[in-house]
């Protein structure tokens, strides 16, 4: 259990998602969190699990970020 959860009483769940962006890992992270926020409530933190990219004809064309998002379960 990540240390940052210790001060937040309750039960939490982890959701793993992948965000993509043509410009940066940071934009891919923001896009993933923004999309998850449309359907997941009570998100509290994220961990970057992995960063990948795509190369086409010698050029970086896509940044990919795998995130684990922690959110509190409702009662």
Per-region residue spans from a language model:
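Short, Lys/Arg-enriched N-terminal segments with co-localized hydrophobic residues
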Residues: 1-7
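Charge-dense, low-complexity polyampholytic segments
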Residues: 41-55
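Short glycine/proline-enriched loop/turn "hinge" motifs that connect secondary-structure elements
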Residues: 7-8, 59
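Short, well-ordered alpha-helical segments
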Residues: 9-45
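A cross-kingdom feature marking charged/low-complexity
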Residues: 51-75
């Amino acid at each position: 259990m990540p240390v940052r959860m210790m001060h937040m009483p309750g039960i939490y769940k982890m959701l793993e998602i992948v965000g993509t962006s043509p410009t940066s890992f940071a934009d891919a992270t923001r896009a993933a969190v923004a999309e998850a926020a449309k359907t997941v409530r009570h998100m509290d933190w994220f961990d970057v699990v992995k960063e990948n990219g795509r190369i086409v004809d010698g050029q970086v064309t896509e940044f990919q970020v795998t995130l684990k998002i922690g959110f509190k379960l409702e009662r």
